[in-house]
């Protein structure tokens, strides 16, 4: 029974297949399994016995137990063997053509499949004799078939890539075992194995199997075809075929190798049968091949076909075929060396191998056809599929070729892939890349001339010829460098408390902020009490709840205590405010008494001073806060400000506590995810009220605890360096430890700078007097505020002036009372101006109270003050004290300011070496950035501005950017040790606009060398004074601070010659050279540099940064001058100054010399207007050369210094030149002081040369100003102050910048580092600062294209300068060679292109104009060569274009669509349709709207103001997204250069919307051009990703910075159509000529070989006479050549004599021979004349360069050789039947001269085309035109037939005498009458006749 069941089971399973394995294999597998069978043993034994019996009967169906044996073996094998690949595939079932999903598992030589992976039973297939192939030509469904001797499976993969993976895995599973199992050896084995690569196909004609020789089955002859050699087999015969595919290497040639003396010969490789239609035998020229059987042969290389009988007569060597130049012969590839490259032996002759990469997926899988076609034409080893192998394998194999070409058959993305691999292998110099367009866009192929698409592979041989004749051009490639601000998403909860408790905690913080705001803003007592009580309860509850969850956290406990203390201080401030409010005027006295009792005396030997490592104690902090309160109470509303400070302090403490309770959260996310970002409280202020701002200290937290708001994220994106150092610092780092910073890098607000010793003493009038002493530079003495040396142990009342030190910050101010600022060490200097103005107002108010009965005008006050100063020049100043911010030091002596009615000169460089913010340098007008922001953005009116009824002020300050101000890059100026001070509202408003980082840049006192604002006004008549006036701001600092002090001169001199690294100095610090326009002598000064901080990895500052300073005294002199005042001048005409300087002062003084151009005329004009008692006194000025040969620098105020209107300029005003010696930080000689003052009347100008010691004096109110900038200033500009400051010109900007040409030339040549933001983004300094001499013509300035910079001044100045100097030379037009990049579109300057910020207006202009100054503190010193790309990585390489915005969004959507539905994107037309649909979608959605708010664009370092746009495109080639010329034209114009891909220039255009992108495909748009530049930077702001595409490949880019830099250049092959036409015409001519010679020679030979009469015909006789003439002439001139040059070869003379003797033998005694003997004799003549011709040509070719021939001899010899060549072509020597050689002449050779007869063209046609006589001489002869064909003879018609390979109809055409005229009129019926019956032949002849007629 059991046996029957088994049989029944087997019968049911048998129809699944007839595959049977041998019994032996069944036994071996059963025995090797080693497991117990679940079925009984007896059936298994019987099974084996039955199998042995049926061993020879494979078709017997009785094998009962075989199924069980196979299943058990499969299960055990699956558990033991290694799996190569597994996964699901679709298996084709033969019933109803359905597909089933099956799980396949591939192992070594075995394939298993089942329904799913969990099945225990798998069907197995033995792969020992495997054949696999693709199903179909295009193979759209990614199917392949597996054929073994027993099974055949059709499988389908999801994608072509997966199919390629399975085929590769099958190849690996069946490949022999090798020591190295990498993919390269697998591909190498595939290349060298000569195995066929099958694919299933059908045939249109009968085809026969190359294995069994039978016809393929079916009407369509369906079978398998090898994609390389076109071998045809049945599917059942594929496994039996031998490996005789096309050869690849010398080893694969095998036994067919032919070796000769010259080397290895390339033999033919024959394939039998299945010849193409109308194949002709290469030997007998007859048709071969058959559709009836497999016969005849074809060569796989040269494509020659021969009969079986003719094959032995075929030449042995294979000519390789039409693509010989591109083919790598297998005989040249010997082996693969150890470096995975071929050992190549270059073949003889021309050889330019072609490496082909084909993307089989491109063009709707068109790449598959091209891949197979290329393998058929070329060596299969030089054709690679990018999908399966990639470019690396082919490039490695071709590495040893000296030069080769690469053809990439794909789209732009694959081209970029190949070029990237070329970069990796560094093979730019040895390869040239061509592109065959198979993709959708193909922009690069369009530009290179290869068209938009290539779909037909039938003309591939002709296409290869085009690539062989291509020319080479260089393609620029650009690196896309990306600096991403990656923010990881936190995975854990950010706080240790639960979510509910976190919400409660957030509510508490919000409530506390609410109550704090009520406390600060309310005026209601009840509300104040209620909010205070609620605040205390909330803080207590908050502290309790947080402490419960963090009981063991000691730091948190400390922070909670700090919070309670700050809350108590807030309550104390409230109490003080209430006391002051009720006590009225007693408030100040009460506060003074409290402060006096609370401040302890600080001893000189403080523990902090002795040990800098000890942090600042709490008492010191309280002392600072008390002092600040004491100072702030002297102003109106100071109580509110103090209360505001305390509230902000409490708020910050709350934030610190909450942040510390979130240890798991990154610091930059803590505040964002839990509570709102910290925002300082502000005082409510009316718009018209002037709120005093006395405190400069920041109210925002330090940089390391700033939340990543929008503002800060924008700024962090600007810095090219990663912000890990800033973000990684603990927020409490500076709270707990006070690091000992080096003095050069010390923070001015920390005690780690220069230590301060404070002493308090009681003054004579009962006031408390503070005296501060500071350690001297050498450490040997202490210096007080007045600059006097103090003994280390001096008492309070002792002050011995032992040594005078240099004043680096001295600001003398006229006032009557000393104002002491004890907090100067803890404040930056940016609100110094405001503090001074407020103090001045207070002083003026006191003076007015004292002098109520005597109204005094301001001018008289000032004159009186000046007179007092002049009367006591040597008197020591009693009320001199240090002015640190915000205190004011009062000094009555303005020694560096001269004011008059016509001009005011201020020296801001002299010893004011402290680094200042941009807010310090501007005065009463709205030229300050802070003032501008306060005017336009803030509700707080700053006291920087004049009040509404105030007169015009001249109290502006120009910041001094001395390069000696060393600043640590990460200097902790924002330490929490500095408490928030009053006056924070204005800074909050700034921070809301600029962001916290820029606000810190404003508050920091460490700016670099980038002053950007110049203020000046032309001297004019005095304006009426306003009611109120603010005096000029002045500064003093008696103690030199280490950080800001200028080193002594001798230290610089000693270091001058020892600096070997010039790159360490800032390139703006080099003092620029400016010519003196009024003096012939040009003075120079040696360059001065600023030292950079040296950094080492892992540390902050290297030892090299700390340089020891030395002091050396220099001798100097005192210059005294008195300047009498003019009697009738209403304003101050001069200042009586006595500059008493010490030796140390002289070492750092700056001399300013102002000279009058045309001084004689000026003096004459002045004398006529002045009274006789006017005295002009000038001090003796030494030689301009001073110091150690140091030259004086001279700045000229020429026409560029006129005011902007240029209307009311007095032509009598002389030109003023300023000679400056700016202080040098490291190098330079001593500068001797020069004092020379010349007061003049208001109607004229004046000359001033004065010594400035760093002090600023009072200027006249109504005087014009001329300000001298330090060496970092970009140039000199003029600012016009309007009477009404609110009414300005449309293009007026008080912060306008202009560049002096000399300064620009200096900047462009400077190589070193800078802290400029604008220069830091430059990639080479000289690329962004062009020579401004070319500014007017090319509009390619650094600032051209923006209305922020007044180039009208520069243009006018240049024009006037040319007129003055009399330069009337004609200037040549500016071409592209003279244009400097970047070239900015002038449209950018128009109003419709808004400014950088959306708000626009004055604020944006100020921000951009002062960008370098604002960002200096947060910008590290950037070296353009070293730190430029720090933190960047190369994302990709751009070859075509870069897009950000809408175009990238469309490309990204298309890419996602193609990945999701590949079947919808398989044709080019469908892809274009999808692009249109997605573009229309963007028209409605506008996902990239307002892109200008999210990105910033810089071109060559210049910030470009962007309009409202949706995208930015950067073009390298003039083709964009499918052939659009998005630039708008391909030619140059007045502004831009012509676009090209080999000029290292990028074109930047704007994309305003999808409508514009669509319209640009139809018309050329040019309004959207932005710039042409050499480098681009794009800053992505915000937190969202933005779509970006490069060459059509799109992705989403996170926020950060993108830089596009030039990477390299690659050689590209461009189509050369002119060369193609020339080669085509030449080849056509050669083919016709050779065919004609062969036909005539064969016909003549056959005609005369059979005839008995060997007499030369009459026509031949005519040719013979021409031949004799040519030989005679050649012999004559060759003999004459040898005689003229005896040094030449004598054997040539012998050859000439032999030819002459042979020639004499055919016409003895002047008569030609007759009969057959003539032809025999002619053979000798022909041979000797040919030898003479060859030897003569060889001699001239070898020795022609050294021969000096006479002109007539050279001409005649050349003509003789040319005639001889033509005559030899007409001769032929043939062997007759009798064995003799006879000569024959070709009388039917075509005439090479073109028919000169042409139809006369009309007169107007000839006139329009011009003279064509010279042009026609160079045109090739047109032999296939209608005119030429109309004159053809019968023989020429026959030649025409033979060129079309239709020689079988020659006899019919000869018989009917068909000439050219009849040929052009032949029709289909006529051809039938002539015997042309084949339809294909009729069509070919008719088409050829049509072509002739059309030509």
UniProtKB/Swiss-Prot annotation:
The keyword Cell cycle is annotated on this UniProt entry: no
GO biological process: diacylglycerol metabolic process; intracellular signal transduction; phosphatidic acid biosynthetic process; phospholipase C-activating G protein-coupled receptor signaling pathway
Residues covered by the SAM domain: 1832-1895
UniProt biased composition (Basic and acidic residues): 1-10, 1113-1128
GO cellular component labels: cytoplasm; plasma membrane
Record-linked InterPro entries: ATP-NAD_kinase_N, C1-like_sf, DGK, DGKD_4H, Diacylglycerol_kin_accessory, Diacylglycerol_kinase_cat_dom, NAD/diacylglycerol_kinase_sf, PE/DAG-bd
Domain PH as annotated: residue spans: 82-175
Zinc finger (Phorbol-ester/DAG-type) in chain: 195-245, 267-318
Ranges of biased composition (kind: Low complexity): 20-37
Gene3D superfamilies associated with the record: 2.60.200.40, 3.30.60.20, Pleckstrin-homology domain (PH domain)/Phosphotyrosine-binding domain (PTB) (2.30.29.30), Probable inorganic polyphosphate/atp-NAD kinase, domain 1 (3.40.50.10330), Transcription Factor, Ets-1 (1.10.150.50)
Enzyme Commission identifier(s): 2.7.1.107
Residue ranges, compositional bias (Polar residues): 1172-1184
Subcellular location: Cytoplasm
Chief localization: cytoplasm
Top-level EC class as recorded in UniProt: transferase
The keyword Zinc-finger is annotated on this UniProt entry: yes
Domain DAGKc per the UniProt entry, residue ranges: 349-485
Keywords recorded for this protein, A-Z: ATP-binding, Cytoplasm, Kinase, Metal-binding, Nucleotide-binding, Phosphoprotein, Repeat, Transferase, Zinc, Zinc-finger
Ranges for region Disordered: 1-37, 781-801, 1012-1053, 1113-1137, 1172-1191
GO terms, molecular function: ATP binding; ATP-dependent diacylglycerol kinase activity; zinc ion binding
Reactions it catalyzes: a 1,2-diacyl-sn-glycerol + ATP = a 1,2-diacyl-sn-glycero-3-phosphate + ADP + H(+)
Entry similarity comment: Belongs to the eukaryotic diacylglycerol kinase family.
Function: Phosphorylates diacylglycerol (DAG) to generate phosphatidic acid (PA).
Entry protein name: Diacylglycerol kinase eta
Organism: Drosophila melanogaster (Fruit fly)
């Amino acid at each position: 029974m059991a046996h029957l069941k088994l049989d029944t089971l087997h019968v049911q399973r048998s129809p699944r297949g007839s595959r049977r394995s041998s019994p032996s294999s069944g036994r071996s597998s059963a025995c090797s399994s080693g497991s117990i069978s679940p079925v009984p043993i007896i059936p298994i034994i019987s099974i084996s016995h039955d199998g042995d019996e049926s061993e020879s009967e494979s078709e017997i169906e009785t094998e009962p137990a075989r199924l069980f044996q196979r299943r058990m073996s499969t299960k055990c094998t699956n558990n033991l063997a290694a799996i190569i690949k597994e996964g699901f595939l679709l298996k084709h079932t033969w019933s109803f053509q359905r597909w089933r999903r099956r799980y396949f598992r591939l192992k070594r030589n075995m394939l298993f499949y089942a329904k799913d992976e969990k099945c225990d039973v798998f069907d197995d297939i033995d792969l020992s004799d495997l054949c696999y192939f693709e199903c179909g030509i295009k193979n759209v469904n990614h199917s392949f078939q597996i054929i073994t001797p027993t099974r055949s499976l059709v499988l389908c993969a999801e994608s072509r890539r997966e199919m390629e993976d399975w085929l590769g895995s099958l190849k690996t599973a069946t490949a022999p075992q090798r020591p190295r199992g990498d993919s390269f050896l697998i591909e190498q084995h595939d290349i060298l194995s000569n195995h066929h690569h099958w694919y299933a196909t059908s045939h249109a004609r009968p085809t026969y199997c190359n294995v069994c020789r039978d016809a393929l089955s079916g009407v369509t002859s369906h079978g398998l075809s090898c994609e390389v050699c076109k071998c045809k087999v049945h599917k059942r015969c594929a496994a039996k075929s031998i490996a005789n595919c096309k050869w690849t290497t010398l080893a694969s040639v095998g036994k067919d190798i032919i070796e000769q003396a010259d080397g290895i010969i390339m033999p033919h490789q024959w394939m039998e049968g299945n010849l193409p239609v109308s194949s002709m035998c290469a030997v007998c020229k007859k048709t071969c091949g058959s559709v009836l059987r497999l016969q005849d042969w074809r060569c796989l290389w040269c494509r020659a076909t021969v009969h079986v009988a003719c094959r032995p007569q075929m030449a042995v060597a294979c000519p390789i075929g039409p693509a010989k130049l591109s083919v790598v012969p297998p005989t040249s590839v010997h082996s693969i060396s150890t470096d995975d490259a071929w050992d190549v032996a270059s073949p003889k002759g021309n050889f330019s191998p072609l490496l082909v990469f084909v993307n089989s997926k491109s063009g709707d899988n068109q790449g598959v056809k091209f891949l197979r076609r290329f393998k058929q034409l070329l060596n299969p080893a030089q054709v690679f599929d990018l999908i399966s192998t990639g470019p690396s394998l082919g490039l490695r194999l071709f590495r040893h070729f000296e030069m080769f070409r690469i053809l990439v058959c794909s789209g732009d993305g694959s081209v970029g892939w190949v070029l990237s691999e070329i970069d990796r292998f560094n093979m730019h110099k040895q390869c040239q890349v061509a592109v065959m367009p198979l993709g959708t866009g193909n922009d690069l192929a369009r530009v290179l001339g290869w068209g938009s698409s290539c779909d037909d592979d039938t003309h591939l041989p002709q296409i290869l010829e085009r690539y062989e004749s291509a020319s080479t051009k260089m393609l620029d490639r650009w690196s896309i460098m990306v600096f991403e601000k990656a923010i990881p998403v936190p995975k854990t909860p950010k706080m240790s408390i639960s979510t509910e408790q976190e919400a409660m905690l957030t509510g508490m913080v919000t409530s506390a902020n609410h109550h704090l705001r009520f406390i600060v803003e309310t005026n209601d007592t009840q509300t104040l009490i209620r909010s205070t009580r609620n605040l205390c309860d909330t803080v207590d509850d908050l502290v309790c709840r947080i402490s419960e969850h963090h009981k063991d956290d000691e730091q948190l406990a400390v922070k909670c205590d700090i919070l309670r203390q700050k809350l108590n201080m807030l309550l104390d401030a409230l109490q003080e405010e209430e006391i002051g409010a009720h006590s009225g005027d007693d408030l100040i006295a009460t506060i003074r008494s409290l402060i006096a009792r609370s401040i302890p005396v600080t001893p000189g030997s403080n523990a902090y001073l002795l040990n800098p490592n000890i942090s600042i104690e709490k008492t010191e902090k309280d002392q600072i806060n008390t002092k600040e309160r004491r100072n702030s109470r002297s102003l109106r509303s100071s109580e509110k400000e103090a209360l505001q400070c305390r509230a902000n302090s409490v708020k910050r403490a709350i934030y610190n506590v909450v942040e510390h309770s979130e240890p798991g959260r990154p610091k930059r996310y803590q505040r964002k995810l839990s509570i709102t970002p910290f925002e300082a409280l502000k005082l409510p202020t009316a718009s018209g009220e002037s709120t005093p701002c006395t405190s400069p200290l920041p109210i925002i937290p330090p940089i390391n605890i700033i939340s990543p708001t929008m503002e800060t994220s924008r700024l962090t994106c600007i810095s090219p360096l990663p912000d890990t150092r800033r973000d990684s610092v603990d927020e409490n780092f500076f709270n707990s430890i006070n690091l000992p910073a080096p003095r050069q890098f010390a923070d001015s607000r920390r005690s780690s700078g220069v230590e301060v010793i404070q002493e308090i003493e009681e003054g004579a009038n009962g006031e408390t007097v503070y005296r501060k002493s500071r350690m001297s530079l050498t450490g040997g003495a202490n210096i007080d505020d007045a600059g006097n040396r103090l003994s280390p142990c001096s008492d309070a009342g002792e002050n011995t002036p032992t040594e005078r030190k240099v004043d680096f910050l001295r600001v003398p101010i006229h006032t009557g009372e000393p104002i002491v600022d004890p907090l100067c060490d803890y404040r930056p200097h940016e609100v110094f101006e405001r503090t001074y103005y407020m103090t001045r107002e207070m002083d003026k108010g006191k003076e007015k109270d004292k002098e109520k009965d005597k109204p005094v005008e301001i001018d008289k006050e000032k004159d009186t003050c000046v007179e007092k100063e002049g009367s006591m020049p040597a008197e020591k100043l009693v009320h001199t004290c240090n002015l640190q911010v915000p205190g004011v030091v009062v000094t009555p002596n303005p020694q560096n300011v001269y004011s008059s009615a016509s001009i005011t000169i201020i020296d801001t460089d002299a010893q004011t070496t402290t680094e200042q913010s941009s807010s310090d340098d501007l005065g009463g007008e709205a030229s300050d950035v802070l003032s501008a922001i306060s005017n336009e953005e803030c509700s707080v009116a700053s006291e920087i501005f004049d009040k509404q009824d105030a007169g015009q002020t001249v109290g502006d300050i120009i910041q001094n950017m001395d390069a000696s101000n060393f600043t640590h890059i990460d200097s902790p100026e924002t330490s929490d040790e500095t408490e928030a001070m009053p006056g924070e509202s204005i800074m909050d408003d700034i921070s809301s606009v600029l962001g916290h980082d820029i606000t810190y840049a404003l508050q920091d006192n460490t700016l670099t060398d980038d002053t950007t604002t110049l203020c000046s006004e032309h001297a004019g008549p005095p304006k009426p004074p306003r009611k109120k006036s603010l005096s000029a701001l002045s500064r003093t600092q008696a103690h030199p601070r280490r950080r800001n002090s200028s080193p002594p001169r001798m230290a610089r001199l000693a270091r001058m010659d020892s600096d070997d690294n010039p790159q360490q100095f800032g390139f703006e610090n080099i003092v620029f050279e400016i010519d003196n326009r009024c003096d012939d002598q040009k003075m120079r000064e040696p360059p001065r540099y600023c030292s950079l901080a040296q950094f080492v990895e892992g540390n902050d500052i290297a030892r090299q940064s700390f340089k020891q300073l030395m002091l050396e005294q220099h001798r100097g002199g005192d210059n005294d001058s008195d300047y009498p005042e003019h009697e009738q001048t209403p304003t101050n005409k001069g200042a009586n100054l006595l500059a008493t300087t010490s030796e140390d002062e002289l070492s750092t003084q700056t001399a300013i010399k102002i000279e009058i151009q045309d001084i004689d005329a000026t003096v004459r004009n002045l004398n006529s207007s002045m009274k006789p008692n006017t005295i002009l006194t000038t001090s003796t000025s030494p030689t301009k050369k001073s110091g150690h040969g140091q030259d004086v620098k001279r700045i000229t105020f020429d026409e560029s210094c006129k005011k902007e209107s240029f209307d009311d300029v007095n032509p009598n005003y002389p030109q003023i030149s300023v000679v400056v010696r700016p202080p040098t930080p490291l190098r330079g000689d001593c500068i001797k002081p020069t004092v020379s003052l010349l007061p003049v009347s208001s109607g004229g100008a004046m000359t001033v040369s004065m010594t400035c010691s760093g002090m600023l004096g009072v200027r006249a109110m109504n005087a014009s100003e001329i300000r001298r900038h330090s060496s970092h200033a970009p140039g000199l500009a003029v600012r016009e102050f309007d009477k009404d400051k609110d009414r300005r010109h449309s293009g007026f900007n008080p912060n306008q910048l202009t560049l002096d040409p000399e300064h620009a030339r200096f900047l462009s040549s400077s190589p070193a580092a800078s802290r400029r933001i604008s220069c830091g983004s430059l990639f080479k300094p000289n690329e962004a600062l062009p020579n401004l001499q070319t500014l007017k013509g090319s509009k390619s300035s650094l600032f051209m294209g923006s209305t922020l910079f007044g180039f009208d001044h520069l243009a006018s100045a240049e024009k006037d300068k040319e007129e003055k100097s009399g330069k009337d030379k004609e200037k040549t037009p500016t071409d592209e060679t003279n244009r400097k990049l970047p070239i900015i579109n002038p449209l950018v300057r128009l109003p419709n292109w808004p400014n950088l910020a959306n708000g626009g207006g004055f604020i944006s202009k100020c921000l951009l104009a002062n960008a370098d100054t604002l960002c200096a503190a947060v910008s590290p010193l950037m070296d353009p060569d070293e730190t430029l790309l720090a933190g960047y990585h190369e994302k990709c390489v751009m070859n075509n274009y870069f897009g950000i915005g809408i175009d990238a969004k469309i490309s990204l959507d298309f890419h996602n669509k193609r990945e999701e539905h590949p079947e919808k994107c398989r044709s080019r037309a469908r892809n274009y349709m999808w692009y249109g649909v997605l573009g229309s979608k963007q028209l409605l959605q506008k996902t990239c709207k307002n892109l200008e708010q999210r990105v910033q664009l810089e071109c060559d370092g210049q910030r470009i103001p962007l309009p409202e746009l949706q995208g930015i495109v950067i073009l390298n080639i003039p083709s964009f997204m499918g052939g659009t010329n998005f630039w708008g034209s391909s030619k140059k114009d007045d502004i831009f250069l012509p676009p090209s891909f080999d000029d290292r220039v990028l074109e930047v255009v704007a994309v305003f919307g999808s409508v514009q992108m669509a319209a640009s495909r139809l018309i050329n748009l040019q309004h959207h051009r932005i710039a042409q530049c050499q480098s681009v930077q794009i800053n992505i702001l915000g937190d969202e990703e933005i779509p970006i595409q490069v060459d059509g490949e799109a992705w989403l880019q996170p926020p950060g910075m993108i830089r596009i830099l030039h990477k390299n250049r690659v050689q590209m092959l461009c189509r050369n159509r002119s060369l193609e036409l020339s080669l085509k015409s030449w080849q056509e001519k050669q083919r016709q000529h050779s065919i004609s010679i062969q036909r005539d020679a064969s016909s003549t030979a056959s005609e005369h070989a059979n005839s008995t009469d060997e007499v030369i015909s009459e026509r031949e006789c005519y040719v013979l006479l021409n031949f004799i003439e040519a030989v005679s002439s050649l012999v004559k001139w060759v003999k004459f050549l040898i005689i003229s040059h005896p040094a030449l070869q004598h054997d040539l003379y012998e050859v000439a004599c032999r030819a002459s003797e042979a020639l004499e033998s055919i016409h003895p005694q002047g008569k030609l021979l007759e009969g057959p003997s003539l032809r025999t004799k002619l053979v000798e003549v022909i041979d000797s004349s040919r030898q003479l011709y060859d030897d003569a040509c060889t001699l001239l070719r070898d020795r022609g360069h050294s021969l000096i021939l006479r002109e007539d001899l050279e001409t005649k010899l050349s003509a003789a050789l040319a005639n001889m060549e033509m005559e030899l072509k007409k001769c032929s020597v043939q062997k007759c039947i009798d064995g003799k050689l006879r000569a024959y002449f070709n009388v039917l050779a075509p005439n090479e001269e073109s028919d000169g007869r042409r139809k006369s063209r009309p007169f107007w046609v000839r006139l329009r085309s011009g003279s064509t006589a010279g042009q026609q001489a160079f045109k090739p002869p047109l032999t296939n035109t209608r005119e030429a064909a109309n004159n053809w003879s019968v023989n020429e018609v026959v030649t025409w037939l033979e060129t079309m390979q239709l020689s079988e109809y020659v006899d019919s055409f000869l018989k009917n005498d068909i000439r050219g005229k009849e040929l052009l009129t032949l029709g289909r019926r006529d051809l039938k009458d002539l015997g042309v019956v084949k339809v294909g032949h009729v069509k070919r002849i008719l088409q050829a006749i049509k072509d002739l007629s059309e030509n």
